[in-house]
From Swiss-Prot:
BP GO terms, sorted: protein transport; RNA stabilization; snRNA export from nucleus
Oligomer status and interactors: Found in a U snRNA export complex with PHAX/RNUXA, NCBP1/CBP80, NCBP2/CBP20, RAN, XPO1 and m7G-capped RNA. Part of a precomplex with PHAX/RNUXA, NCBP1/CBP80, NCBP2/CBP20 and m7G-capped RNA. Interacts with NCBP1/CBP80. Found in a complex with snoRNA, Interacts with NCBP2/CBP20. Interacts with DDX39A; this interaction stimulates PHAX RNA binding activity.
Organism whose genome encodes this protein: Bos taurus (Bovine)
InterPro entries in alphabetical order: PHAX, PHAX_RNA-binding_domain, PHAX_RNA-binding_sf
Name of the protein: Phosphorylated adapter RNA export protein
Pfam families on file: PHAX_RNA-bd (PF10258)
Residue span of region Necessary for poly U RNA-binding and snRNA export: 279-287
Gene: PHAX
List of residues that carry N-acetylalanine: 2
Family stated for the protein in its record: Belongs to the PHAX family.
Entry GO CC: Cajal body; cytoplasm; nucleus; ribonucleoprotein complex
Basic and acidic residues bias (residue ranges): 178-193, 369-394
Motif (Nuclear export signal): 130-139
Biased composition (Acidic residues): 1-18, 65-77
Length: 394
C-alpha cells in the first residue's frame, strides 16, 4: 500500500474514492456489449429493446461531456459517432430477420397481384406447353386456375370435341344402315336399280362424276359388224355403265340407226350438251343418246317400250315396294292406336273415323305376309277377328 501511495501523482485521491473519480475516458463502453452481444444472443427481440442501453449511454455521455474539457482523443469521438449513427439510422423492421435457412416467409393472406397480367399469361403458356407434352405421352396435365373464370381448359375442350365427333360418326353410320335396310347396297345393285333406298340420294352419289364422251373410241364400227361389237363400242364411247340397255337398243333398232344416233350424240356434246327437264344439270352422254332415241320420229313407240320395258318394270316394282312399306308402317300405328283406345257402345263417330284406315291397314298387312320379300308381322301384333261383323263395329 505504501508503494502504491508513493506511485500516486499529485492531485490523486485515496483508494476509497477511486471508484467515484474515474475519468470518463477510462470507463468501459457498454455500447458494444449491448449492441453486439445482446443483438447476437437475442435475434427475436424488437429493435427498440435492443437500442435501449444505447439511449441511456447517450444521456450519460452528454452530461459528462459538459463537465469535462474538449481534450478527448479523436478515437473516442469516432467511436461515439459510429455507435450513435448505427443506433438511430437503422430503419425499423416489421419482423425480425430469421437466420434459419430452412425457414421461409409465409405468404401474406389476401394479397392481390397488381400489374401481373403478362407474367401470368407467360406462365400459363408455359404450363400449356407442359400439359400438351403430357397429353402426347398419355398423361393428363393440370391447368392453372389462378385466373378463375378466365381460365380455359383446352385439353378438356379437345377431349369433348373428339367424343362429339365420334358420337356423330356413329349416328351417321346407324342412319346409313337404317336407310339401306340394314345392308349396304353394292354399286352393281345401284346401277341395275335393285337397291331400295328410303331416301333419294344426291346426284353425285347416284350418277357419279360426269364423264366426258370419248369421241375417237377404240376402233371404227360399221353396219356390217356384229351387234355385240357395235353395242360394246357405243357403250365405251358414251361412258355408259348400263351396257345391257345399249345392247337392247342395238338389237331392236339395228346397227345403222344406232351408229347414226351415236354421231348425233357426239355433235350435241361438242356443242355443249343437253340439260335435264328442270335444268339443274347437264345430261350424261348416255342420257343424250337415249333422249335422241326417244325423240326420233323413225323409231316407233312399240320399239321404245320394248327397249325400256325392264327399266320401267324395275321402277314400278320399286315404287310398289315403297308404297307397301308406307302402308305397313301406317298399319302398325293404327293397331297401336286401336289397342290404346276404349270405344263406348254408343260412340258411332269414333268407330266410323277409324273404320276405313283399319281396313286399309289390315289389307296391307295381309299383302305383306303374302309377299316373299317383305317382312312378316309377329303373332302378337295381329288383330284378332272372330267374326266378319266385328270390323263393322269400328
Amino acid at each position: 500500500m505504501a508503494q502504491e501511495a508513493g506511485d500516486m501523482d499529485d492531485g490523486q485521491v485515496s483508494d476509497s474514492d477511486s471508484d467515484m473519480t474515474v475519468a470518463p475516458s477510462d470507463r468501459p463502453l457498454p455500447v458494444p456489449k449491448a449492441l453486439g452481444g445482446d443483438c447476437g444472443l437475442r435475434p427475436f427481440q424488437s429493435t427498440a429493446t435492443a437500442c435501449a442501453p444505447a439511449s441511456h449511454y447517450r444521456t450519460v455521455k452528454s452530461v459528462d461531456s459538459s463537465e469535462e474539457s474538449f481534450s478527448d482523443s479523436d478515437d473516442d469521438s469516432s467511436v461515439w459517432k459510429r455507435k450513435r449513427q448505427k443506433c438511430f439510422n437503422t430503419p425499423p423492421k416489421p419482423e425480425p430477420f430469421q437466420f434459419d435457412q430452412s425457414s421461409q416467409k409465409p405468404p401474406i393472406a389476401g394479397r392481390k397481384k397488381v400489374n401481373n397480367i403478362w407474367s401470368a399469361v407467360l406462365q400459363e403458356q408455359n404450363q400449356d406447353a407442359v400439359a400438351t407434352e403430357l397429353g402426347i405421352l398419355g398423361m393428363e396435365g393440370t391447368i392453372d386456375r389462378s385466373r378463375q373464370s378466365e381460365t380455359y381448359n383446352y385439353l378438356l375442350a379437345k377431349k369433348l370435341k373428339r367424343e362429339s365427333q365420334e358420337h356423330t360418326k356413329e349416328l351417321d353410320k346407324e342412319l346409313e344402315e337404317y336407310m339401306h335396310g340394314g345392308k349396304k347396297t353394292g354399286p352393281k345393285e345401284e346401277e341395275n336399280g335393285q337397291g331400295h333406298p328410303k331416301r333419294k340420294r344426291p346426284v353425285k352419289d347416284r350418277v357419279g362424276d360426269r364423264l366426258e364422251m370419248n369421241y375417237k373410241g377404240r376402233y371404227e364400227i360399221t353396219e356390217d359388224d356384229s351387234q355385240e361389237r357395235v353395242a360394246d363400242e357405243i357403250s365405251f364411247r358414251l361412258q355408259e355403265p348400263k351396257k345391257d340397255l345399249i345392247a337392247r337398243v342395238v338389237r331392236i333398232i339395228g346397227n345403222k340407226k344406232a351408229i347414226e344416233l351415236l354421231m348425233e350424240t357426239a355433235e350435241v356434246e361438242q356443242n355443249g350438251g343437253l340439260f335435264i327437264m328442270n335444268g339443274s344439270r347437264r345430261r350424261t352422254p348416255g342420257g343424250v343418246f337415249l333422249n335422241l332415241l326417244k325423240n326420233t320420229p323413225s323409231i316407233s313407240e312399240e320399239q321404245i317400250k320394248d327397249i325400256f320395258y325392264l327399266e320401267n318394270q324395275k321402277e314400278y316394282e320399286n315404287k310398289k315396294a315403297a308404297r307397301k312399306r308406307r302402308i305397313q308402317v301406317m298399319g302398325k300405328k293404327m293397331k297401336q292406336a286401336i289397342k290404346n283406345l276404349n270405344f263406348q257402345e254408343d260412340d258411332d263417330t269414333s268407330r266410323e273415323t277409324f273404320a276405313s284406315d283399319t281396313n286399309e291397314a289390315l289389307a296391307s298387312l295381309d299383302e305383306s305376309q303374302e309377299g316373299h320379300g317383305e317382312t312378316k308381322l309377329d303373332a302378337e301384333e295381329a288383330i284378332e277377328v272372330d267374326h266378319s261383323h266385328d270390323l263393322d263395329m269400328f
